[in-house]
Amino acid sequence: MMRAISNKIIRSLCVLGLGYLGLHLGHPPSALADLGCSNATLKGTYLFAYDGWQIDADGVRKPGAFSGIEIYNGDGTMRGIYSGGVDGVVSRMVGYTGTSTIHPNCTGEQTFTDDGTGLVTHNDIFVAPSGEEFTFVYTDPGIVSAGSERRVKFRVGKPERD
């Protein structure tokens, strides 16, 4: 009888423990919280830099690095300019446009279109609730790259100093 009660208690504790882990590891509360973000969170001028790899059809990794400046309009639209290169082939001062969808939990998706080539790329984005900075990772096949952006303040003619 005592052994049956012990087994029942142990099983109950295991079920409770697994339930707790499922609730807290399966869906972290902080990742699902409404942090107040929206497309309006990204507004202003941002500087960025990132590096990574492009992987061609034969599986050959080609190193790449880029930096540039982007202007977000606070309505999910933006424009930017970058310089960078992949595997030693450099592109300078290339313009592009893009759209962002920022969710209340400060995650989102971005789509960019290169002005010259029409190439379309995609990112997942993770935004600070203040909109001061964000990180991103490319989600297109064959691109392994991530980076960050930080909002900067400009006055007409020269950078503003904090």
How would you label these PLM feature ranges?
Residues 26-162:
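Mature soluble binding/inhibitory domains
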Residues 2-16, 22-23:
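Bacterial N-terminal signal peptides that target proteins for export
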